[in-house]
A protein has these predicted regions:
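Structural detector for short beta-strands of small beta-barrel domains
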Residues: 4-7, 24-45
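Beta-strand/loop nucleic-acid-binding surfaces
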Residues: 55-74
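Intrinsically disordered, charged low-complexity linkers and terminal tails
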Residues: 47, 68-72, 91
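Transition segment at domain starts
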Residues: 1-20
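Short, acidic/hydrophobic/Gly-rich beta-strand patch recurrent on exposed beta strands
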Residues: 47-54
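OB-fold/S1-family single-stranded nucleic acid-binding modules
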Residues: 85-100
């Protein structure tokens, strides 16, 4: 299991952490998943990696305007009820993450 921290891009590369199986959520709704990894991105956002109860692996960006919601402070390994919503431009984003 990985440490409970936000990994830098360099750490992900140097540790050989493979994130290629993770994809963006493509539909709104609720699901249950375990937080596997937290990482920086090339922008001011963070990235959260979840293993969902149905076996999917989801990559979720947390944008600067979502940082106040504390998503990046959730401990790695936490099982969460995740709520994804679709915005007015059709993009899907994480609206809420509540420990189960």
């Amino acid at each position: 299991m990985l440490e409970d921290k936000i990994y830098t891009l360099e750490e992900i590369r140097s540790l050989g952490i493979d994130t290629h199986e993770y994809v963006f959520m493509d539909q709104p709704g609720e699901t249950t998943g375990t937080l596997v990894l937290k990482a920086e991105s090339r922008t001011q956002s963070k990235r959260l990696f979840f293993s969902l109860s149905d076996g999917r692996k989801i990559l979720t960006p947390v944008f600067w305007w979502q940082l106040s919601r504390g998503f990046q402070n959730i401990p790695t390994g936490t099982v969460l009820k995740l709520t994804y919503v679709q915005n007015s431009t059709g993009q899907i984003h994480l609206e809420n993450a509540v420990p189960v």
